[in-house]
C-alpha cells in the first residue's frame, strides 16, 4: 500500500504516505492496492477512448463510466474491495468493446499505451492485490526522484477531483465532448508514467483549465434543474418527528428523496456539503426539508450515532460507521461503499423511508438556530455594484474567501480564528465544508450586506471566480489587483483540482493549509511559490497583516 492523496496521510522523517495495513482514512491496504489496479485499468480504457476518437467513435457508455469509476477512488468514498474490482472488470470489458469498434473500422488499429491490454490475473482478491503491486504509484520513485513523483501525483489527484465533478455534472444530464476527450487524453498519458517535469507542470495547468469548464457545466446542470440559489434561512436545530439525513453533494438524490418522502410524515435534513441545497428554489419548496444537522464530516461518528433515523451517503465523505454502531441504518448510493452497509442501486429510496418510519425520530423540536445560505452566482453578480460602491466609499476594505475542506487536525482551528479576526469593515465569502468552522457564528453586516456570505459547495468556487472576474472588469483591473484574498483549507482531491483551477486562471498569492499536501516536495513548493505566490498559512496575526497590506 502507498497512498498520499489526502491531508491526514501519515508523515514521518522517512517520508510521507500511508503504507501499512490500513490508511488514516480507514482504507485497508487491500482496498488501496485494488484502487491502484482500477486506476491502471481506467488508464487503459482512456487510451482506447483516445484511439477511438481518432476514428470518429465516441462511446457514451465509456464516457459516462470512466470518471464515475475514478471518483470511487477519491478519499472517503468507497472502501468495498469487491466493488472496486467490479469497476476494474467493467473498465476492461468496456475497453475490449471499444477496441472491437476500432478494429471494425481499421483491422490494424492498435494502442501503444502500457495499460491498453491489462487483464486481471484472477478472481481472487489476494492474487489481484499482488498484481496491483505493479501499479503502486511510487514503485519507480528511486529512478525518477521525489519531485517527478510529486508532480505525477498532483496531476493524478487533480484529475481525480475533476472526474468527481464530471460525474456530478453527468448525473444532472450535462455532457461536453471536448471535456471528455481532454479527460481521456490526460488519463491515458498518465498511464505512460511520464517523467518530464515541464510536461507534468503543463498537464497540471491543463487539468485546472479543464476543471473550470467542468464546473461551468455542473453549475448549468444544478441551476437549470433546481433554479438559481437565493439567500435562504436554514434551521440547524432538530424538529419533532421522524427523519432521514442525507449527506454528500448529489442534489438529484436529494430531490428524489424529497419527492418520495412527501406526505409520509418523514422530515429530511441535509448534512455536510448538502447544506447549500436549501438555497435552490426547486428543493426548498418541499416543506419537509426542515433543516441542516451536524457539522463537519469528520464529526459524523458522534453526530450520526445521535441521529434518530437512517442516513444516506450520496458521495464523499463516509468514515467507519461501525464506530458509532449506526452501520445498520446508513445507506450508500452511487459510487459510495462500505463493507456490510446497505447499498441503494437505483433511485428508489423506499427501504430508507420504511426504516425511518420504524424509528423514533426526534421527540421534540429544539429552539431554532438560523443561518443563511444561498448566495449563488446570480445573487453574487447582482451584488457586484453594491460591493464596488461600498469599496469606493471606503465602507468595505477587503474581501476574504475563507473556505475549502474541513478535517480533524487541531491546526484547522486556524480558519475559525482567522474568520473571527477579520476586521468589521471586511467581508467573508465562504464555500465548501470548511465553512462549518465558523458558519454558525454571528458576523453582522455592512450597510445591510451580510459580512458572512455562503456561496455553496466546493464546486461553487466557479461562482466566486465569476464574481471576481466581474468585479475586475467593472473596476478596470486584474483579478490579482482586487482587494480580495483567498485563504483555503484542503483535505482531498476536489480541493487539489480547485487549486489547480485557480492557478491555471492566473490567481496568485493564495494562502492554504493547514499543511502542505504530502506529495509536495520542498522543491515543488518553491516552484509554486515563485510562479504563483502560493504559500502555507503561518499565524492568523501575520497572515492577516500581510493580506490586508497587499
From Swiss-Prot:
It is found in: Cytoplasm. Its main location: cytoplasm. Coiled coil: none annotated. Its EC number is 1.7.99.1. GO terms for cellular component: cytoplasm. Keywords: 2Fe-2S, Cytoplasm, Iron, Iron-sulfur, Metal-binding, Oxidoreductase. Its cofactor is [2Fe-2S] cluster; hybrid [4Fe-2O-2S] cluster. The keyword Oxidoreductase applies. Binds 1 [2Fe-2S] cluster. Binds 1 hybrid [4Fe-2O-2S] cluster. GO terms for molecular function: 2 iron, 2 sulfur cluster binding; hydroxylamine reductase activity; metal ion binding; peroxidase activity. The modification Cysteine persulfide is found at residue 405. SUPFAM superfamilies: Prismane protein-like. GO terms for biological process: nitric oxide catabolic process; response to hydrogen peroxide. [2Fe-2S] cluster binds at residues 3, 6, 18, 25. It comes from the Bacteria. The keyword Metal-binding applies. It catalyses: A + NH4(+) + H2O = hydroxylamine + AH2 + H(+). Hybrid [4Fe-2O-2S] cluster binds at residues 249, 273, 317, 405, 433, 458, 492, 494. Catalyzes the reduction of hydroxylamine to form NH(3) and H(2)O. Belongs to the HCP family. HAMAP family: Hydroxylam_reduct. This is Hydroxylamine reductase. The lineage of its organism: Bacteria, Pseudomonadati, Pseudomonadota, Gammaproteobacteria, Enterobacterales.
Amino acid at each position: 500500500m502507498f497512498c498520499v492523496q489526502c491531508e491526514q496521510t501519515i508523515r514521518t522523517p522517512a517520508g510521507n504516505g500511508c503504507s501499512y495495513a490500513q490508511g488514516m482514512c480507514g482504507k485497508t491496504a487491500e482496498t488501496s492496492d485494488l484502487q491502484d489496479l482500477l486506476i491502471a485499468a481506467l488508464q487503459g480504457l482512456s487510451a482506447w477512448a483516445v484511439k477511438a476518437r481518432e476514428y470518429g467513435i465516441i462511446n457514451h457508455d465509456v464516457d459516462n463510466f470512466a470518471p464515475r469509476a475514478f471518483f470511487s477512488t477519491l478519499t472517503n468514498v468507497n472502501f468495498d474491495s469487491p466493488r472496486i474490482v467490479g469497476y476494474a472488470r467493467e473498465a476492461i470489458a468496456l475497453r475490449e468493446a471499444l477496441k472491437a469498434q476500432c478494429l471494425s473500422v481499421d483491422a490494424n488499429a492498435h494502442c501503444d499505451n502500457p495499460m491498453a491490454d491489462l487483464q486481471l490475473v484472477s478472481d481472487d482478491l489476494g492474487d489481484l492485490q499482488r498484481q496491483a503491486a505493479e501499479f503502486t504509484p511510487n514503485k519507480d520513485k528511486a529512478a525518477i526522484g521525489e519531485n517527478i513523483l510529486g508532480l505525477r501525483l498532483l496531476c493524478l489527484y487533480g484529475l481525480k477531483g475533476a472526474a468527481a465533478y464530471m460525474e456530478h455534472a453527468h448525473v444532472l444530464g450535462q455532457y461536453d465532448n471536448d471535456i471528455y476527450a481532454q479527460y481521456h487524453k490526460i488519463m491515458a498519458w498518465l498511464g505512460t508514467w511520464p517523467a518530464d517535469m515541464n510536461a507534468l507542470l503543463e498537464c497540471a495547468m491543463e487539468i485546472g483549465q479543464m476543471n473550470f469548464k467542468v464546473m461551468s457545466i455542473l453549475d448549468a446542470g444544478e441551476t437549470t434543474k433546481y433554479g438559481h440559489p437565493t439567500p435562504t434561512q436554514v434551521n440547524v436545530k432538530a424538529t419533532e418527528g421522524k427523519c432521514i439525513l442525507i449527506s454528500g453533494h448529489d442534489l438529484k438524490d436529494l430531490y428524489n428523496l424529497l419527492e418520495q418522502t412527501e406526505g409520509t410524515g418523514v422530515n429530511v435534513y441535509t448534512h455536510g456539503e448538502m447544506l447549500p441545497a436549501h438555497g435552490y428554489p426547486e428543493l426548498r419548496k418541499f416543506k419537509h426539508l426542515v433543516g441542516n444537522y451536524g457539522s463537519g464530516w469528520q464529526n459524523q461518528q458522534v453526530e450520526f450515532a445521535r441521529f434518530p433515523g437512517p442516513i444516506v451517503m450520496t458521495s464523499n465523505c463516509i468514515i467507519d460507521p461501525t464506530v458509532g454502531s449506526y452501520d445498520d441504518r446508513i445507506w450508500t448510493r452511487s459510487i459510495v461503499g462500505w463493507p456490510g452497509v446497505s447499498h441503494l442501486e437505483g433511485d428508489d429510496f423506499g427501504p430508507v423511508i420504511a426504516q425511518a418510519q420504524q424509528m423514533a425520530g426526534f421527540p421534540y423540536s429544539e429552539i431554532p438556530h438560523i443561518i443563511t445560505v444561498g448566495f449563488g452566482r446570480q445573487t453574487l453578480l447582482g451584488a457586484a455594484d453594491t460591493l464596488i460602491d461600498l469599496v469606493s466609499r471606503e465602507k468595505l476594505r477587503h474581501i476574504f474567501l475563507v473556505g475549502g475542506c474541513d478535517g480533524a487536525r487541531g491546526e484547522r482551528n486556524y480558519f475559525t480564528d482567522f474568520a473571527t479576526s477579520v476586521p468589521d469593515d471586511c467581508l467573508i465569502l465562504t464555500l465548501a465544508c470548511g465553512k462549518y468552522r465558523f458558519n454558525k457564528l454571528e458576523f453582522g453586516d455592512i450597510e445591510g450586506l451580510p459580512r458572512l456570505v455562503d456561496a455553496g459547495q466546493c464546486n461553487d468556487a466557479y461562482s466566486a471566480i465569476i464574481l471576481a472576474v466581474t468585479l475586475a472588469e467593472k473596476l478596470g483591473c486584474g483579478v490579482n489587483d482586487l482587494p480580495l484574498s483567498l485563504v483555503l483549507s484542503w483535505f482531498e482531491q476536489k480541493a487539489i483540482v480547485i487549486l489547480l483551477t485557480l492557478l491555471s486562471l492566473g490567481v496568485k498569492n493564495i494562502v492554504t493549509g493547514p499543511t502542505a499536501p504530502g506529495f509536495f516536495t520542498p522543491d515543488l513548493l518553491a516552484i509554486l511559490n515563485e510562479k504563483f505566490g502560493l504559500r502555507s498559512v503561518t499565524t492568523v496575526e501575520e497572515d492577516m497583516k500581510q493580506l490586508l497590506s497587499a
